[in-house]
Amino acid sequence: MELEYESKRPLYIPYAGPILLEFPLLNKGSAFTEEERNHFNLQGLLPDAVETIEEQAERAYRQYQDFKNDSDKHIYLRNIQDTNETLFYRLLDSHLSEMMPIIYTPTVGEACEHFSDIYRRARGLFISYPNRDRIDDMLQNATKQNVKVIVVTDGERILGLGDQGIGGMGIPIGKLSLYTACGGISPAYTLPVVLDVGTNNPQRLNDPLYMGWRHPRISGDEYHAFVEEFIQAVKRRWPNVLLQFEDFAQNNATPLLNRYRDEICCFNDDIQGTAAVTLGSLIAASRAAGSQLRDQTVTFLGAGSAGCGIAEQIIAQMKSEGLSEDEARARVFMVDRFGLLTDKLPNLLDFQSKLVQKSENLTAWQTQSDAISLLDVVRNAKPTILIGVSGQPGLFTEELIREMHKHCPRPIVMPLSNPTSRVEARPEDIINWTEGAALVATGSPFAPVHYKEQQIPIAQCNNSYIFPGIGLGVLASGATRVTDAMLMAASRALAECSPLATDGHGALLPDIDDIQGVSKCIAMEVGKAAQLQGMAVVTSEEALSKAIEHNFWRPQYRSYKRTSF
């Protein structure tokens, strides 16, 4: 096989001695052979034994198990990543379902809050506003030259934790770890970036150890000019890169996506990735119930950019199943802190305005006040699907869920807020309140629920089912943009991988340990959609499949040969 040949072919490198051991992408530690130790001036710098990567991974896993709390485990794994990336990904490869909650949600949230306290070693780029005239130089300073995927944040809306300043860097680092572990994208091609535009978090500003720019956040024209400078510099340095916007605040997320999605190959995972994985889950859940999404009525708690992004994808799918635009929009109800979005509410954001319900259609509703509450919507609209993206814990109350179950024998309830401390309701409660009838998917990981004689698996509606496959599909196909059709293709591919939808039993979403296969399936459909839309060169399916395999990196050591600079 071509990949086997690639892994056996030697890599020619100019580094030697302690410098080589300090290079995470190239360091093998105790796995350097005797020949390599001689050629690269490593004799005496390592213990005598020459180990395999399997032996190294076994030792690392034993050390990992010695840590009792998740935060310490996260720090330990990050240390391995900053020391020997190949070993880090071999360890993840062997224990992905166990370690994913440690390297990403929910543990990464705590790591972001304490970023300056637990900081060990530089990774990625920190681009601060005071240095805005030197962005080109900063990109040249990146240790990776052939960058193909960037995840960038400004740290303002980190999970459900709000403004963390440069602490938000934990999210791009974690996200790119999953691009590699789940989607096979070589870590040599990835770059995490934080745009340090200050912070409005008084805890960070008053923390003597805070490592970011100690200044209130810039906003308005200054902010957008800074982002523009960054984007143009990226285009000059890596014109074909895939750029993922991550954890930008609501007032910036959608405008930035709309501004740049037709200029560069980019997407916003909070808006589009969340929408894609949720839509894929809902298509699968509808199939499992013997229906289509067009037959469902959907209520959202949370009408921010993420919730509205999901709603628009649901509407697009309903239209593809035969509903008109008006019919589809009439089936989607958006509730925020001021109640149901209607055409009488003032000061709606642009992306919210298309998702309002017409007041004339609500005249027969029985409500408690002029502001139509979530409970009012459940009583009157009688939804079959309830989705939480509010970031506020406990808002899916027992009264609410029982009311929903009165008119819906098999309610689909998705409390998607992250981290776990922000979830709208716990799966165990939802299942108990519906006498075991509810189909539950969450944003953070939860253990299976024991109900009577059943063990009910809880699907984690995690973006990691989607974005690694999108990234792999973009790289393999050479796509120049990420379009709505490509995202829709990703959702449908995920639905095809659902055990519950295909077999009639099991979990709603595939096991996390099967996610590499899922990513390849998604990559194929994303690549085909890119070709159909003229965003990639048209090839045969066989050629696209080979390109996906060729781009799928595996954590194996290659032999090294020495060369000069």
Curated annotation (Swiss-Prot):
<dbReference type="GO" id="GO:0051287">
    <property type="term" value="F:NAD binding"/>
</dbReference>
<dbReference type="GO" id="GO:0005829">
    <property type="term" value="C:cytosol"/>
</dbReference>
<dbReference type="InterPro" id="IPR012302">
    <property type="entry name" value="Malic_NAD-bd"/>
</dbReference>
<dbReference type="GO" id="GO:0046872">
    <property type="term" value="F:metal ion binding"/>
</dbReference>
<protein>
    <recommendedName>
        <fullName>NAD-dependent malic enzyme</fullName>
        <ecNumber>1.1.1.38</ecNumber>
    </recommendedName>
</protein>
<feature type="binding site">
    <location>
        <position position="246"/>
    </location>
    <ligand>
        <name>a divalent metal cation</name>
    </ligand>
</feature>
<dbReference type="Pfam" id="PF00390">
    <property type="entry name" value="malic"/>
</dbReference>
<dbReference type="Pfam" id="PF03949">
    <property type="entry name" value="Malic_M"/>
</dbReference>
<feature type="binding site">
    <location>
        <position position="270"/>
    </location>
    <ligand>
        <name>NAD(+)</name>
    </ligand>
</feature>
<feature type="binding site">
    <location>
        <position position="247"/>
    </location>
    <ligand>
        <name>a divalent metal cation</name>
    </ligand>
</feature>
<dbReference type="GO" id="GO:0008948">
    <property type="term" value="F:oxaloacetate decarboxylase activity"/>
</dbReference>
<feature type="binding site">
    <location>
        <position position="270"/>
    </location>
    <ligand>
        <name>a divalent metal cation</name>
    </ligand>
</feature>
<dbReference type="InterPro" id="IPR036291">
    <property type="entry name" value="NAD(P)-bd_dom_sf"/>
</dbReference>
<keyword id="KW-0479">Metal-binding</keyword>
<comment type="subunit">
    <text>Homotetramer.</text>
</comment>
<dbReference type="InterPro" id="IPR012301">
    <property type="entry name" value="Malic_N_dom"/>
</dbReference>
<dbReference type="InterPro" id="IPR046346">
    <property type="entry name" value="Aminoacid_DH-like_N_sf"/>
</dbReference>
<keyword id="KW-0560">Oxidoreductase</keyword>
<keyword id="KW-0520">NAD</keyword>
<dbReference type="GO" id="GO:0006108">
    <property type="term" value="P:malate metabolic process"/>
</dbReference>
<feature type="binding site">
    <location>
        <position position="418"/>
    </location>
    <ligand>
        <name>NAD(+)</name>
    </ligand>
</feature>
<feature type="binding site">
    <location>
        <position position="157"/>
    </location>
    <ligand>
        <name>NAD(+)</name>
    </ligand>
</feature>
<dbReference type="InterPro" id="IPR037062">
    <property type="entry name" value="Malic_N_dom_sf"/>
</dbReference>
<feature type="active site" description="Proton acceptor">
    <location>
        <position position="175"/>
    </location>
</feature>
<comment type="similarity">
    <text>Belongs to the malic enzymes family.</text>
</comment>
<dbReference type="GO" id="GO:0004471">
    <property type="term" value="F:malate dehydrogenase (decarboxylating) (NAD+) activity"/>
</dbReference>
<dbReference type="InterPro" id="IPR015884">
    <property type="entry name" value="Malic_enzyme_CS"/>
</dbReference>
<feature type="site" description="Important for activity">
    <location>
        <position position="270"/>
    </location>
</feature>
<dbReference type="InterPro" id="IPR023667">
    <property type="entry name" value="NAD_malic_enz_proteobac"/>
</dbReference>
<feature type="active site" description="Proton donor">
    <location>
        <position position="104"/>
    </location>
</feature>
<dbReference type="InterPro" id="IPR001891">
    <property type="entry name" value="Malic_OxRdtase"/>
</dbReference>
